[in-house]
Amino acid sequence: MAATLGSGERWTEAYIDAVRRNKYPEDRPPESHDPCGCCNCMKGQKEKKSENEWSQTRQGEGNSTYTEEQLLGVQRIKKCRNYYEILGVSRDASDEELKKAYRKLALKFHPDKNCAPGATDAFKAIGNAFAVLSNPDKRLRYDEYGDEQVTFTAPRARPYNYYRDFETDITPEELFNVFFGGHFPTGNIHMFSNVTDDTHYYRRRHRHERMQTRKEEEEDKPQTTYSAFIQLLPVLVIVIISVITQLLAANPPYSLFYKSTLGHTISRETQNLQVPYFVDKNFDKAYRGASLRDLEKTIEKDYIDYIQTSCWKEKQQKSELTNLAGLYRDERLKQKAESLKLENCEKLSKLIGLRRGG
């Protein structure tokens, strides 16, 4: 028993002495005696786990990470050939469906949330798609000409250019602010606080362009004011001459309507078409016989021109109401359009009949 303990103590002392002579670096653990191979098994499991984590999470631009799902989402956006595919909606999608799709994708692809390569461009494409499809006029124009423009700009089936064919009135950043007030729903992350380099370049470039434009406008402002005055000078001269001419000219001998300011308060009718007109108290002394007949022809011509213009306006108003009723399927507008009377058109028909009869 003592011999056994003695040999065990000697073995322990020898092991400690070996450890002292061969110290391991602090950053490398000592290799342990593993006759069963358990350590190798655990090491294999760790390497396998590390490979799985790498397949799920990869390094993005800078020190940010992104998932495989985010990368696949960006690649899907790049492959889309129209705005409907980008938002993942049908061509007859309603406004609510468009808003719902945009809200979901904007949060998913915002550069603060998605650091995958191309996420910024995908975010811009999503914003541009919603800005166009949410505008009735632009959506109608896109539905009519969008496919033709795709064929023209991409004859070799290249990815669709989302930024040139249809220009929007609002940037993706401003559109995101409209929906989320400049913040994510959590309220913690501000717009573009950690975006990629191309987005910073995009914002710096536009800031520089705005400053340059403002500087040029300030430099050209005096010259622009002077040029505008020179251009308006002929118009001002014409207006002044016209006013002076009207002040110096004598009052017209008649009016188609009652005008007390001109003294045209006495009602008369033309002999041929019974067109009503108004004159002053001295009219009978100035116009008799042939001069009266010539003047009444002029009156009838002026009246017919006035009635024709009024008739055209009535038809235009009725046509617009009818089109609006059909567009919005509004029964009230339809009834209003049908009940609208074309009084001046009826007067014009009577005048034409009288002229033919005369």
Curated annotation (Swiss-Prot):
Record's GO cellular component terms: endoplasmic reticulum membrane
Oxidoreductase found in the keyword field: no
Keywords: Chaperone, Endoplasmic reticulum, Membrane, Transmembrane, Transmembrane helix
Subcellular location: Endoplasmic reticulum membrane
InterPro entries in the record: DnaJ_domain, DnaJ_domain_CS, DnaJ_subfamily_B/C, DUF1977_DnaJ-like, J_dom_sf
This protein's record includes keyword Mitochondrion: no
Disulfide bonds: none
Transmembrane segments annotated in the record for this chain: 228-248
SUPFAM superfamilies according to UniProt: Chaperone J-domain
Protein name: DnaJ homolog subfamily C member 18
Organism annotation: Bos taurus
